[in-house]
Curated annotation (Swiss-Prot):
This is Nicotinate-nucleotide--dimethylbenzimidazole phosphoribosyltransferase. The gene is cobT. GO terms for biological process: cobalamin biosynthetic process. GO terms for molecular function: nicotinate-nucleotide-dimethylbenzimidazole phosphoribosyltransferase activity. NCBIfam families: cobT_DBIPRT (TIGR03160), PRK00105.1 (NF000996). InterPro entries: Nict_dMeBzImd_PRibTrfase (IPR003200), Nict_dMeBzImd_PRibTrfase_bact (IPR017846), Nict_dMeBzImd_PRibTrfase_N (IPR023195), Nict_dMeBzImd_PRibTrfase_sf (IPR036087).
Amino acid sequence: MNIENLIKGINGLDNKVMSKIQKRLDNLTKPLGSLGTLEDIVKQLGGITGEVYPSVKNKTVIIMCADNGIVEENVSSCPKSVTASVTRNFMKGFTGINVFTRHAGADIEVIDIGVDADINEEGIINKKIRRGTSNMIKGAAMTRDEALKGLEVGIEAVKELKDKGVNLIGTGEMGVGNTTTSSAVASVLTGCPVDEMVGIGSGLTKEAFRNKIQIVKEAIALNKPNKEDPIDVLSKVGGFDIAGLAGCFLGAAIYRIPIVIDGFISASAALLAVKINPLVKNFIIPSHGSAEPGSKWIMKELDLEPMLNLKMRLGEGTGAALAFQIVDMAVFSYLEMGTFENAEIEPYKPLK
């Protein structure tokens, strides 16, 4: 796979289709623009797919699972073994994302991109780069080649889903320590002070929280990631799950399929992808504003506004699955509402 050529081949939205969708929206039996963001979503879907009547019936959340060497520094309240346990539990149907996708009419695709354990459960896709990243306060988290391999895993995952007829993708992750790596990546890419980017993750004491902030500062100071080179940032202070998800966002733009951000980790990956190619932003739909404090910095940098503010910080793709249902409503209203001709009434006219 020639990633560079694929990324260079990304194009923008189809403005002609978006204009046609706008015309239909303005002819539906409602005041002009009264469905707000729902109308924007439909236009975006059309601009991505080139379809005047877009469909999002086939939905999947991709969950990238990986361990992070930085957990050696006590940055998480959970032991590293939780990554493997939850990864396996995704196949048992009772995790948060299982419940959310079940009721959103969506599937999940679980990818082991770097879990520090042998994961042999049926249904889990093995794309393990290696068993967890290195401890980033002792050196780079991964090599540049490994970072590129992570992007490739995500791009390929999207292509395979597109080939199967999936037309809406969500992004999720599982990896103890990944709010630490995401904080480092996002702090470098946004210029946000580490103290304002780092949050409590899965839950930390005040002392552990202060330690987490210090660890992120030390990792950035040691590795000196180049803000102008997103792949350098990823390789030095990122994680395999972030790499895979960034690849998913790139893949969505390459293969023209809408993709939904979940929470903080997913947003960090989205930011990374947009820094690689700014056109990727056109293919991204935000879901919720994570309770992690750095989330607002990333959304500001992306110039995106979350649909929901529910103070969630579970991850796994749960916020994306929630947003699926809003996207569904956007499409249903566009496709199923009557027009002024149907209703035999005069259409609304724009105010001058």
